[in-house]
């Protein structure tokens, strides 16, 4: 995210960053220069993404994609709406699959094109995790999550205007 933002800024573009901060990936001012934070008008909203066993298993009944849905936050959604009401954007880049629950909000409040920057195909990672475990129940559950993620990932490509895949392999898989 930082290198892309810096490149866009150096090319004379106006950049606004609104970011999710989690327990695993907390936002810390010290990791960014004051200049970068000022130029990007950086905002960070904490979202609780810790695995909740009850929510994880209830997603089996509701068929929600738990891996993705735990990144949705009404606080972040409200902050996003506020930004979209105040400013117009040409492009809104979603920095991972886990930001896609906000596509509906973006579409309702902006005419901007939405680009998904895909770091990897998440379902492949979960498939590998499933294959690596010897616990049969866990393997079944992880395979279920991998299947759900695959359906979600390939469904979401129809909801965005473009995909910026990090690797050629992922770009080819998305194109298939």
Where are these regions (language model features)?
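N-terminal subdomain of nucleotide-sugar transferases
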Residues: 1-43, 85-87
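Short active-site oxyanion
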Residues: 14-15, 88-92, 158-163
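Short N-terminal targeting/anchoring amphipathic segment
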Residues: 80-101, 113-115
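A short helix->loop->beta-strand "cap" motif at the edges of active sites that frequently abuts
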Residues: 13, 109-113
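Acceptor-binding helix/loop patch of EC 2.4 sugar-transfer enzymes
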Residues: 55-66, 114-151
């Amino acid at each position: 995210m930082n290198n892309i933002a810096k490149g866009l800024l150096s090319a004379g573009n106006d950049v606004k960053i609104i970011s999710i901060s989690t327990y695993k990936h907390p936002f810390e001012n010290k990791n960014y220069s004051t200049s970068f934070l000022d130029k990007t008008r950086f905002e960070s909203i904490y979202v609780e993404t810790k695995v909740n066993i009850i929510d994880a298993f209830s997603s089996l009944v509701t068929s929600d994609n738990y891996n993705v849905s735990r990144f949705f936050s009404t606080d972040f959604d409200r902050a996003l709406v506020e930004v979209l009401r105040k400013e117009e954007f040409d492009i809104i880049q979603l920095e991972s699959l886990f930001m896609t629950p906000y596509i509906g909000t973006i579409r309702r409040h902006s005419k901007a094109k939405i680009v998904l920057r895909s770091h990897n195909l998440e379902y492949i990672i979960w498939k590998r995790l499933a294959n690596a475990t010897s616990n049969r129940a866990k393997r079944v559950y992880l395979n279920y999550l991998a299947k759900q993620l695959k359906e979600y990932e390939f469904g979401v490509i129809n909801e965005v205007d473009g995909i910026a895949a990090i690797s050629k392999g992922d770009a080819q898989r998305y194109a298939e």
